């Protein structure tokens, strides 16, 4: 699958759907906290870069962050988080639930509905 810029915007916004899709700053913190929960499973030499990207998990700034960092860095960060999230026997139940729900929403986003719209954008 080839990722497009809008895919990265969508991925960065998925956390908002997971916790209620809100402009509430506490929700933004909750999204970042969930990403930080993966820190123990991210290779040590990659933690700083991943956490810097995690800090950009904000509904208002995600599109700007994509432009600022570029698609390659986002692709890398998502790949690292995915590998961390899918490490065998490593995730606790909260992390597993978060990852499962994010992936469910992500794949819903990939499939247009009968009107040609993507679920995660509705």
Residue ranges: model-predicted function:
Residues 1-122:
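Small-residue-enriched hydrophobic alpha-helices in membranes
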């Amino acid at each position: 699958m080839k990722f497009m810029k809008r895919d990265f915007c969508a991925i960065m916004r998925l956390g908002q759907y997971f916790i209620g899709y809100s402009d509430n700053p506490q929700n933004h913190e909750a999204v970042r906290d969930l990403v930080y929960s993966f820190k123990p499973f991210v290779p040590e030499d990659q933690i700083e870069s991943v956490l810097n990207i995690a800090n950009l998990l904000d509904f208002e700034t995600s599109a700007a962050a994509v432009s600022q960092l570029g698609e390659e860095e986002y692709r890398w960060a998502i790949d690292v988080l995915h590998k961390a999230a899918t490490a065998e026997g490593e995730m606790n139940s909260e992390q597993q639930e978060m990852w499962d729900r994010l992936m469910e929403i992500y794949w819903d986003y990939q499939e247009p509905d009968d009107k040609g719209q993507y679920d995660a954008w509705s």
